[in-house]
């Protein structure tokens, strides 16, 4: 049986103190760093972390979900970001980046192709605006998989084109592994890229990536499991 990293987070939320003993973060200095990193962002779904604790951990902001909790995702107490949280982060000088992911695995958003892209882009745009996100800021659409080229061409391309049709090319970000980022760049899809390492060559960072997720499920901040991301370009989709 395969267990995804999000299943691990779900287990951690249900069994506090069992997972992550000894990895509660007071500093992110031990996290891997991409060459040329301009700072660290956290991403998380299992709760809401006060700005003061994010700053104390050494991060400059957070990548936050503008998507609903999926069925069975009651543990995702941090989805979607709310206006009060966004005000806490921005009011304390922290950066916010919006990302969207509703389904996963067999229910992954991109599997629905073009029609799903329209649906999810509209919902992401609504939740982004409700949290105070400006109409100029991008939203990273998630390809949280290691897809084949056939899947990319037949489902991911129409999915991302639909995102662009709803929020615009300049506002469409892509969260994906390095090969999917490469395909998207070659096809002129997306303006911002956030790399994850599932299916990416070890130690490789795509030159087009604005952000790189370098650590998952290894630490907590404020009692919430976090992933660690390195900022690679001065403009990475931040809106606060």
UniProtKB/Swiss-Prot annotation:
Q: What EC designation does it have?
A: 3.2.1.17
Q: List the thermal properties of the activity.
A: Optimum temperature is 38 degrees Celsius for the hydrolysis of p-nitrophenyl butyrate.
Please give the name of this protein. Answer: Putative peptidoglycan hydrolase Rv2525c
The record's listing under SUPFAM superfamilies reads: (Trans)glycosidases
PTM text: Predicted to be exported by the Tat system. The position of the signal peptide cleavage has not been experimentally proven.
Domain of life assignment: Bacteria
- Whose protein is this, by species? Mycobacterium tuberculosis (strain ATCC 25618 / H37Rv)
Q: Which GO terms describe its molecular function?
A: lysozyme activity
Enumerate the Gene3D superfamilies for this protein: Glycosidases
Q: In which pathway does it act?
A: Cell wall degradation; peptidoglycan degradation
Q: Which UniProt keywords apply?
A: Cell wall biogenesis/degradation, Glycosidase, Hydrolase, Secreted, Signal
Q: Which GO terms describe its cellular component?
A: extracellular region
What is the role of this chain?
A: May function as a peptidoglycan hydrolase with glycosidase activity. In vitro, displays esterase activity toward p-nitrophenyl esters of various acyl chain length (C4 to C16), with a preference for p-nitrophenyl butyrate (C4).
Keyword Metal-binding included in the entry's annotation: no
InterPro entries according to UniProt: Glycoside_hydrolase_SF (IPR017853), Rv2525c-like_Glyco_Hydro-like (IPR015020), TAT_signal (IPR006311), TAT_signal_bac_arc (IPR019546)
The protein's location, in the record's own words, is:
Secreted
> What follows loss of this gene?
Cells lacking this gene display an increase in susceptibility to some beta-lactam antibiotics and, despite slower growth in vitro, enhanced virulence in both cellular and murine models of tuberculosis. No detectable difference in the lipid profiles.
| Effect of substituting residue 113 to A | Complete loss of esterase activity
What does UniProt give as the signal peptide span?
1-33
Q: Which reaction(s) does the protein catalyse, per the Swiss-Prot or TrEMBL entry?
A: Hydrolysis of (1->4)-beta-linkages between N-acetylmuramic acid and N-acetyl-D-glucosamine residues in a peptidoglycan and between N-acetyl-D-glucosamine residues in chitodextrins
Q: Which NCBIfam families match?
A: TAT_signal_seq
Expression triggers: Upon exposure to antituberculous drugs such as isoniazid, ethionamide or PA-824, Rv2525c expression is significantly up-regulated together with those of other genes involved in cell wall processes.
- How does the annotated pH dependence read? Optimum pH is 8.0 for the hydrolysis of p-nitrophenyl butyrate.
Q: Name one GO biological process term.
A: cell wall macromolecule catabolic process
